[in-house]
Structure formats: C-alpha cells, structure tokens
Amino acid sequence: MPTINQLVRKGRRDKIAKVKTAALKGSPQRRGVCTRVYTTTPKKPNSALRKVARVRLTSAVEVTAYIPGEGHNLQEHSMVLVRGGRVKDLPGVRYKIIRGSLDTQGVKNRKQARSRYGAKKEKS
C-alpha cells in the first residue's frame, strides 16, 4: 500500500486491457489462406458438427476461424477474409470468416440477414 506522498510523486499505473483479436494486429479484417477445413463438436450442453478452418493470415499467424451459415465451398488453399468475433460454444475459436468475399461464396437461398452471409437479393 503506497503512502499519499508516493502517490503524489508517481501516481497509479493504468491496467492494460488484453486485446481479444491479437492476430488481426489492429486491423478490422485480415486476408488468409486455409490450411485445413474440418468440423468440430461444441462444448457441453450443445451438440453439432461446427464447420471451422485453420487459416494462415497475412500477419503470419495461424488461427482457427468459424465458417458461418449453411453449406460452404472452402477447401485447402482457399483465400478468405477473417474478422474478429468468437463462437461461444467452440473453445479457442475467436475469429470468423466473412462470407461472400474472396474465394468464399455467400449462403444460397438466404432471405433474412443477407448482408451477414454475402447473399445477393433474389430477383422476384
């Protein structure tokens, strides 16, 4: 416990908040190459086969990224755009792949929340 005089002389040091998306190096998105595309199972109360990919980013970091939406066309060596955002029931998955950009196609037959999944407006 510092004395009042020590606080007057030096003050208190601010705590530095830990960055949640360190691999993006401060960028909103990063380009990367898929090194492995596979499925994994979620944490305890949930049950599914979640689609994920190991991606080597342009920042030379390899991360695990979630592939959102139903169905995808990704395979090894696909170029993808990665953004921050974790998947709560997949431990260690702190990034998501942006649908509809680079080699990633948008979700087919998507009617609602289309911009999130790179789906074009249907011609009526």
From Swiss-Prot:
Ranges for region Disordered: 105-124
GO biological process, one term: translation
Keyword Ribosomal protein applies: yes
CDD domains in the cross-refs: Ribosomal_S12
Biased composition regions of type Basic residues, renumbered to the chain: 108-118
Lineage top rank: taxon: Bacteria
Molecular function terms, GO-annotated: rRNA binding; structural constituent of ribosome; tRNA binding
Keyword Ribosomal protein on entry: yes
Keywords recorded for this protein, A-Z: Methylation, Ribonucleoprotein, Ribosomal protein, RNA-binding, rRNA-binding, tRNA-binding
Xref: Pfam families: Ribosom_S12_S23
Modification sites for 3-methylthioaspartic acid: D89
Cellular component per GO, a single term: small ribosomal subunit
InterPro entries: NA-bd_OB-fold, Ribosomal_uS12, Ribosomal_uS12_bac
HAMAP family xrefs: Ribosomal_uS12_B
Role according to the record: With S4 and S5 plays an important role in translational accuracy. Interacts with and stabilizes bases of the 16S rRNA that are involved in tRNA selection in the A site and with the mRNA backbone. Located at the interface of the 30S and 50S subunits, it traverses the body of the 30S subunit contacting proteins on the other side and probably holding the rRNA structure together. The combined cluster of proteins S8, S12 and S17 appears to hold together the shoulder and platform of the 30S subunit.
Subunit structure: Part of the 30S ribosomal subunit. Contacts proteins S8 and S17. May interact with IF1 in the 30S initiation complex.
Family: Belongs to the universal ribosomal protein uS12 family.
The protein's name in its UniProt record: Small ribosomal subunit protein uS12
Organism: Mycobacteroides abscessus (strain ATCC 19977 / DSM 44196 / CCUG 20993 / CIP 104536 / JCM 13569 / NCTC 13031 / TMC 1543 / L948)
